[in-house]
Amino acid sequence: LFEEDFLKKFLLLLGAVVIVFGLLAAPFYIFAKMADGEVARRSLGEGDHNSLKHGLAAAELYATLRPVLGSDYAADLTIVIGEMVEVIEQHTKHETDVAREVYKDLHNNLYGVVAARWMEGAGGSNDRQSRLRLVGWLAETDALADWAEDKRVPESLPWTPDIDAALAAADTDRPRLEAEFRAHLDAHRHDIAADLALAAK
């Protein structure tokens, strides 16, 4: 009886964890349609769709968690969830992503988070449409990494599946990339403001 009761509680807890993770990970799948619209509006290519989708999903998940967890914790949790999604996809996708592809996705996730945080301090609008337009601008100006061949993906990463190597490289590079992303956004503040204003018309 004790074992049966324990098993029920364990299964309920496991189910709750799966549901919570599913809700948190959902942005990495449900924003594809919004990305489609922005890709079409800007006449972007195939690679831009994936990079824009990752950047937007991370930005939106961060923006959702931010009021509850605060900026730093929301950013960290968004990055961790993005990494967990990549780990799960290693076991569920028909074609397993190579390490360079995984790093590329994590690079774009991080840029989405940094962009959303940057908008909070930029003094402008910080709604979903503005975040979409900002990530779209990043895709259009090649700030996001489109392909595994991108020069911003470390040459040391293999062209074979190696999730551990990709995660380790992304974690190591995160402080440097965050600083570079913020500097890029600051340097192009006026271009971004003009692009968002034009898109809003």
Model-derived features: where do they sit?
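Bulky hydrophobic segments
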Residues: 3, 8-98, 116-201
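Divalent metal-coordination and catalytic microenvironments
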Residues: 105
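Functionally important transmembrane alpha-helices
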Residues: 110-115
